C-alpha cells in the first residue's frame, strides 16, 4: 500500500515538472500538435482516401 502512495507522489511531481517548466511545456506542445496532425491525417485518409484514387 505504501508503494502506491509513493508512485502517486512521483506522478504528481512529474506532472508538476512537465507543466510548469516552460521549456518542457513547449516541447510537449510540439509533440501534441504533431500527434494531432498525424491523427487528423489518418482520419482524413480513412474518410476520403478513395477520392484520391486515380
Curated annotation (Swiss-Prot):
Where this protein primarily resides, as one coarse class?
mitochondrion
Membrane topology type: Single-pass membrane protein
The UniProt entry's GO CC annotations, sorted and at most eight, read: mitochondrial outer membrane translocase complex; mitochondrion; plasma membrane
Query: In which tissues is this gene expressed?
Result: Expressed in roots, flowers, young cotyledons and leaves.
List residues in topological domain: Cytoplasmic. Answer: 2-30
Question: A Gene Ontology biological process annotation?
Answer: protein transport
Positions of transmembrane segments: 31-48
Keywords noted in UniProt: Membrane, Mitochondrion, Mitochondrion outer membrane, Protein transport, Transmembrane, Transmembrane helix, Transport
Q: Where is this gene product found?
A: Mitochondrion outer membrane
Q: Summarize the subunit comment.
A: Forms part of the receptor complex that consists of at least 6 different proteins (TOM5, TOM6, TOM7, TOM20, TOM22/TOM9 and TOM40).
Q: Which family does it belong to?
A: Belongs to the Tom5 family.
Function of this protein? A component of the complex responsible for the recognition and translocation of cytosolically synthesized mitochondrial preproteins.
- Provide the protein name: Mitochondrial import receptor subunit TOM5 homolog
| Organism whose genome encodes this protein | Arabidopsis thaliana (Mouse-ear cress)
Amino acid at each position: 500500500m505504501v508503494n502506491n502512495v509513493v508512485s502517486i507522489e512521483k506522478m504528481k511531481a512529474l506532472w508538476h515538472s512537465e507543466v510548469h517548466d516552460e521549456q518542457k511545456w513547449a516541447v510537449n506542445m510540439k509533440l501534441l500538435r504533431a500527434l494531432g496532425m498525424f491523427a487528423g491525417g489518418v482520419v482524413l485518409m480513412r474518410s476520403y482516401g478513395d477520392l484520391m484514387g486515380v
